[in-house]
Amino acid sequence: MSTEAALLKLQSWFSPSFPVGGYTYSHGLEYGVECGLIHHRESLQTWLEGLLQWGAGHGEGVLFHGAYGAAVRQDWAALHEVTVWAQALRPTAELALESRGQGRAFLVAVQQGWPHPWVQRWGDGLAEHAPYGVVTGLACAAHGVPEAMGLSALLHGMVAGWISAAVRLIPLGQQAGVLVQSALEGEIQTLVRALLSQPASAFQAELGGCAWMAEWCSLKHETQYTRLFRS
């Protein structure tokens, strides 16, 4: 696939207008703002750096890498294994809902707009348990999108969604959100290089996280009195 063709797909799939419902999730940021942990641009940037290094950014990136490699090898048993690990390691119910809900919606949209037998084969069996990182990795592999480009687009889109939620919640000005997005580009590139330096077949070695406060905020969000977001 040409670079231009891959770029067009990624701009569609990870656009804010792509129908995965990303705007309905805050990944626990809503409670983090409520209790004062996230209250200005600097605290938001630090929080999101942590999510990339030790939280969902790293976790979904590992799943993307494992799924991409399994799909390229057409090893459907390995792809199933990645999915099972993804389901088992979700720290909270709402974070599981966030990944599964977006993954299912992404799968449906890609099947409709960019049908491919690999995506169809996997989607028919596991559509109800479709982690976001897994289905995006599968779609990129199926359509010949270079892995580094696809993984970078996934992480950039996740960060953009978190920033969008925080801009509305804190609230922050749009310019502050732009500054955070720009500042995190280096973190995204570092994470992509680190993940792709490991063999995809050994993805289990990279699984895990240490974003305890983000997970605590997700747990507290379940019983938060006033909520704008689903997570």
Swiss-Prot record:
GO terms for molecular function: nickel cation binding. Keywords: Chaperone, Cytoplasm, Nickel insertion. Pfam families: UreF. It comes from Magnetococcus marinus (strain ATCC BAA-1437 / JCM 17883 / MC-1). It is found in: Cytoplasm. UreD, UreF and UreG form a complex that acts as a GTP-hydrolysis-dependent molecular chaperone, activating the urease apoprotein by helping to assemble the nickel containing metallocenter of UreC. The UreE protein probably delivers the nickel. The keyword Cytoplasm applies. InterPro entries: UreF, UreF_sf. Required for maturation of urease via the functional incorporation of the urease nickel metallocenter. This is Urease accessory protein UreF. Belongs to the UreF family. The keyword S-adenosyl-L-methionine does not apply. Gene3D superfamilies: Urease accessory protein UreF. It comes from the Bacteria. One of its GO terms (cellular component) is cytoplasm.
